């Protein structure tokens, strides 16, 4: 299998993969090859090797969340989305590296070591699904799955020069996935092209009665949707707030991309979108994170095993919850219920905002990837403020909306830049169509890191 050769060549220097299921993958490939010779093809993913972020449960294969606490954790069952992929004939090749418990944005805080950016080894890949994006960029796998609670699929995809999709909340089941911020979490595909993302995504979507947030909708052929015309799409540009403080190199690439998609579609216009924190009370984030880690934090032997950057995030959560609700259990509960109610109200009404435009287009990130040294100096809760501002990506998690990032250029130093296209709920087909039209009008997605050619 060619991907195993790529892993042997690339993973020692990139550190994108934690576990390589070599024997299991080869056994799967033998079965699938026999089916293909007999004329049976399960789906477009038949025999295709993919990697899974190591927060997604795989039966009999360790799922560690990038943490020493879960180093020996071996699930008995596959996550719902993994079962769907296996039925579709995908070969589960490897488990990818991630920020510990998906809680930081650089991928420098993994128990298994930092993921390096394949375009510049002294730079971060972005996180928390950095291993998935780096593995795809270096051709260790056809595609990969990540999870996204604030940008964790799109952020590393942008900085690694690949395509990443954050779906509408509820289209892909979260059953069997270790949570980061459960109310914001989604599982999404990463691949080399929009077409590949569409094919992978089509096999991931499906109702799961075991996931309270799962949505039962008619199946859609996303690969076909990605080929639909885009000439009438109206593109909104939320410049105020979401284009502030752009790195000049990022601004150059994004503005040129907007010029291209404006010609492909029905034009662009500036629109106003409120700041993301008008929709989200940070108390929700703190409460969701702390609720998963509470018992481990109460056991000192476990608490001491967290990575320093993760520990800072958890300490911030504890302090914020105490300060924001006066320290009483009743106060915390009331604050959480009120904050979630406001969030759900915003989510129910947000589709009405898409009346004067069909999609939003904006920078995925506002600057270039920091160095690993910088990331290790500023770990934890300060990352989002100092190194990796995530307001642009977080907007779509908070509102439960889909968004896709596509490569739109390179800085003068050679680092990839991403353009993000987002829309109302269940508009994945529309977003993929515009992203595909843009991709076919440019050549950015064809570029690969030097050693991956």
Language-model segments: which ranges?
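Gly/Ser-rich catalytic/binding loops embedded in alpha/beta enzyme cores
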Residues: 1-149, 259, 352
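Short helix-loop capping/hinge segments that flank enzyme active sites or metal/cofactor-binding pockets
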Residues: 45-65, 224-238, 287-351, 363-365, ...
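Conserved short alpha-helical elements in the N-terminal third of ANL/AMP-binding
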Residues: 62, 395-397
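Structural helix-boundary/capping segments
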Residues: 9, 13, 87, 137-244, ...
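Residue-level signal for inorganic ion chemistry
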Residues: 3, 25, 197, 235, ...
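Acyltransferase
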Residues: 30, 221, 246-272, 293-304, ...
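Short, well-ordered beta-strand elements within core beta-sheets of diverse protein domains
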Residues: 69-74, 185-192, 314-328, 421-422
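Short, surface-exposed loop/helix-turn segments at secondary-structure junctions
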Residues: 68, 72, 213-214, 281, ...
